[in-house]
Regions:
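A beta-strand edge to alpha-helix "cap/lid" segment located at domain peripheries
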Residues: 22-53, 58-152
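Bacterial N-terminal signal peptides
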Residues: 7-17
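Positively charged n-region of N-terminal signal peptides that target proteins for export
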Residues: 1-4
Length: 152
Protein backbone atom coordinates (compact mmCIF):
# COMPACT_ATOMS: atom_id res chain seq x y z
CA UNK A 1 0.00 0.00 0.00
CA UNK A 2 2.86 2.34 0.85
CA UNK A 3 4.45 1.72 -2.58
CA UNK A 4 1.18 2.56 -4.28
CA UNK A 5 1.00 5.81 -2.31
CA UNK A 6 4.57 6.70 -3.31
CA UNK A 7 3.81 5.90 -6.96
CA UNK A 8 0.77 8.19 -6.90
CA UNK A 9 2.78 10.95 -5.20
CA UNK A 10 5.53 10.72 -7.84
CA UNK A 11 2.98 10.68 -10.65
CA UNK A 12 1.18 13.68 -9.16
CA UNK A 13 4.49 15.54 -8.90
CA UNK A 14 5.56 14.95 -12.50
CA UNK A 15 2.14 15.06 -14.19
CA UNK A 16 2.17 18.86 -14.73
CA UNK A 17 5.61 18.66 -16.33
CA UNK A 18 4.50 15.87 -18.67
CA UNK A 19 1.38 17.78 -19.68
CA UNK A 20 3.41 20.95 -20.25
CA UNK A 21 5.96 19.11 -22.39
CA UNK A 22 3.25 17.67 -24.64
CA UNK A 23 1.91 21.17 -25.36
CA UNK A 24 5.29 22.58 -26.38
CA UNK A 25 6.24 22.67 -30.05
CA UNK A 26 8.89 20.19 -31.10
CA UNK A 27 12.13 21.17 -32.79
CA UNK A 28 10.67 19.67 -35.95
CA UNK A 29 7.59 21.85 -35.87
CA UNK A 30 9.74 24.90 -35.06
CA UNK A 31 11.86 24.15 -38.13
CA UNK A 32 8.80 23.82 -40.35
CA UNK A 33 7.30 27.08 -39.04
CA UNK A 34 10.60 28.83 -39.82
CA UNK A 35 10.73 27.31 -43.31
CA UNK A 36 7.16 28.42 -43.95
CA UNK A 37 7.89 31.94 -42.66
CA UNK A 38 10.98 32.16 -44.90
CA UNK A 39 8.87 30.93 -47.83
CA UNK A 40 6.20 33.58 -47.16
CA UNK A 41 8.80 36.34 -46.82
CA UNK A 42 10.49 35.40 -50.11
CA UNK A 43 7.14 35.41 -51.93
CA UNK A 44 6.16 38.76 -50.37
CA UNK A 45 9.43 40.25 -51.62
CA UNK A 46 9.78 38.51 -55.01
CA UNK A 47 6.36 37.20 -56.05
CA UNK A 48 5.59 34.14 -58.12
CA UNK A 49 9.23 33.45 -59.07
CA UNK A 50 10.13 32.92 -55.40
CA UNK A 51 7.07 30.71 -54.90
CA UNK A 52 8.37 28.16 -57.41
CA UNK A 53 11.85 27.93 -55.87
CA UNK A 54 10.48 26.43 -52.65
CA UNK A 55 8.96 23.45 -54.48
CA UNK A 56 10.64 20.07 -54.92
CA UNK A 57 11.23 18.93 -58.50
CA UNK A 58 8.18 16.66 -58.18
CA UNK A 59 6.19 19.18 -56.13
CA UNK A 60 2.63 20.11 -57.06
CA UNK A 61 0.13 22.82 -56.26
CA UNK A 62 -3.49 21.72 -55.87
CA UNK A 63 -5.43 24.76 -56.99
CA UNK A 64 -8.56 25.98 -55.22
CA UNK A 65 -11.44 24.50 -57.20
CA UNK A 66 -9.11 23.50 -60.00
CA UNK A 67 -6.45 21.20 -61.20
CA UNK A 68 -2.96 20.12 -60.30
CA UNK A 69 -0.02 22.34 -61.30
CA UNK A 70 3.46 20.83 -61.42
CA UNK A 71 6.62 22.76 -60.63
CA UNK A 72 7.51 22.79 -64.32
CA UNK A 73 4.13 24.29 -65.17
CA UNK A 74 4.54 26.87 -62.40
CA UNK A 75 7.86 27.96 -63.92
CA UNK A 76 6.11 28.67 -67.24
CA UNK A 77 3.38 30.81 -65.71
CA UNK A 78 3.69 34.53 -66.15
CA UNK A 79 4.77 36.74 -63.28
CA UNK A 80 2.02 38.21 -61.17
CA UNK A 81 0.60 41.49 -62.37
CA UNK A 82 1.54 44.67 -60.54
CA UNK A 83 -0.44 45.02 -57.33
CA UNK A 84 -0.74 41.26 -56.84
CA UNK A 85 0.46 39.84 -53.54
CA UNK A 86 0.20 36.66 -51.55
CA UNK A 87 0.83 36.63 -47.82
CA UNK A 88 0.26 33.87 -45.32
CA UNK A 89 0.85 32.92 -41.73
CA UNK A 90 1.40 29.39 -40.48
CA UNK A 91 -0.85 28.35 -37.60
CA UNK A 92 0.45 24.85 -36.92
CA UNK A 93 3.19 22.50 -38.01
CA UNK A 94 4.12 18.94 -37.24
CA UNK A 95 6.88 16.61 -38.34
CA UNK A 96 6.88 12.83 -38.73
CA UNK A 97 8.91 10.86 -36.22
CA UNK A 98 11.21 9.90 -39.11
CA UNK A 99 12.23 13.58 -39.35
CA UNK A 100 11.95 13.74 -43.14
CA UNK A 101 8.34 14.75 -43.76
CA UNK A 102 6.07 17.34 -42.22
CA UNK A 103 3.23 19.76 -42.80
CA UNK A 104 2.20 23.29 -42.03
CA UNK A 105 -1.19 24.93 -42.30
CA UNK A 106 -2.47 28.41 -41.83
CA UNK A 107 -4.27 31.36 -43.36
CA UNK A 108 -3.54 33.33 -46.50
CA UNK A 109 -4.52 36.61 -48.13
CA UNK A 110 -4.28 37.00 -51.91
CA UNK A 111 -4.64 40.51 -53.36
CA UNK A 112 -5.05 41.23 -57.04
CA UNK A 113 -6.76 43.71 -59.34
CA UNK A 114 -9.78 42.99 -61.49
CA UNK A 115 -10.24 44.27 -65.07
CA UNK A 116 -11.48 47.60 -63.75
CA UNK A 117 -8.36 48.03 -61.63
CA UNK A 118 -10.16 47.51 -58.34
CA UNK A 119 -8.41 45.53 -55.62
CA UNK A 120 -9.87 42.09 -55.00
CA UNK A 121 -8.96 40.35 -51.75
CA UNK A 122 -9.31 36.60 -51.34
CA UNK A 123 -8.91 34.96 -47.93
CA UNK A 124 -8.25 31.31 -47.40
CA UNK A 125 -6.57 28.43 -45.66
CA UNK A 126 -3.60 26.43 -46.91
CA UNK A 127 -1.67 23.25 -46.22
CA UNK A 128 1.94 22.70 -47.28
CA UNK A 129 3.57 19.28 -47.12
CA UNK A 130 7.36 19.53 -46.73
CA UNK A 131 9.87 16.79 -47.52
CA UNK A 132 13.55 16.65 -46.69
CA UNK A 133 15.57 16.35 -49.89
CA UNK A 134 18.63 14.17 -50.49
CA UNK A 135 20.88 17.25 -50.10
CA UNK A 136 19.38 17.97 -46.65
CA UNK A 137 17.25 20.92 -47.78
CA UNK A 138 13.50 21.04 -47.29
CA UNK A 139 11.08 21.57 -50.19
CA UNK A 140 7.32 21.68 -50.62
CA UNK A 141 5.95 18.53 -52.28
CA UNK A 142 2.27 19.45 -52.04
CA UNK A 143 0.67 22.85 -51.54
CA UNK A 144 -3.07 23.32 -51.47
CA UNK A 145 -5.49 25.97 -50.41
CA UNK A 146 -9.13 26.87 -50.38
CA UNK A 147 -10.78 30.25 -50.21
CA UNK A 148 -12.85 31.13 -47.20
CA UNK A 149 -14.78 34.11 -45.87
CA UNK A 150 -12.89 37.05 -44.44
CA UNK A 151 -11.74 36.26 -40.90
CA UNK A 152 -13.57 38.11 -38.16
Amino acid sequence: MRRLGIAFAVLAAIWPALSFAQNQPSKGSDLLIKLEADFAKAVAEHGRAAFVTYFAEDGVELEDGGGVTTREEMKKQVAWAEGTSLTWTPVRADMAASGDLGFTYGNYVFKSKNKEGQIVITYGKYVSVWKKQSDGSWKVVVDMGNSSPEPK
